[in-house]
Amino acid sequence: KKDNLVLMYQTHSNKVVELKKQNLKKKIKADAMVTRIKNLALGVVTADCVPILIYDKKNQIVGCIHSGWKGAFADIIKNTILKIKKLNSNSEIYASIGPCIGKNSYEVDLKFQKKFIKKSKKNIRYFSKKNKNKSLFNLRKFVHDKLSEFRVNIDHVKHDTFKEKDNFFSFRRS
């Protein structure tokens, strides 16, 4: 039913909202939602960013994350997992990473790359040099590794939204 679908007004932030009966009808401004409410579908809309669906079977908690580079950089994944754990979830958490821009399609300038490396020198592993002014960024791997830090079980739907124009919308291609 349409009444059971909840979408967010996505803001490229690190804000996570826990959905409860009291805030279900309100406009949700965030980039992640989690809930224990049964028969509720959570939705995320992307156009190259990474959609992530999360599930804790034991505690019956579901969540979704809109993770573009800004949100991933600002710890949207960490904030979401911590919010789920705050709901008494110390069991196995499962995540599915959906279609997003691929590592060979995400061209960035060196300023972008330096921003990530300044945060952590280890972030160099998510970049490969394209030419003297540009690099390619592996957003999917960056997001995967952020989930792995919390020992989340991860599945991938490996499609490149930029390259697969017949199947997906791409912000960068438009």
Residue spans of the language-model regions?
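Active-site microenvironment for binding and transforming phosphate-containing groups
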Residues: K1-S174
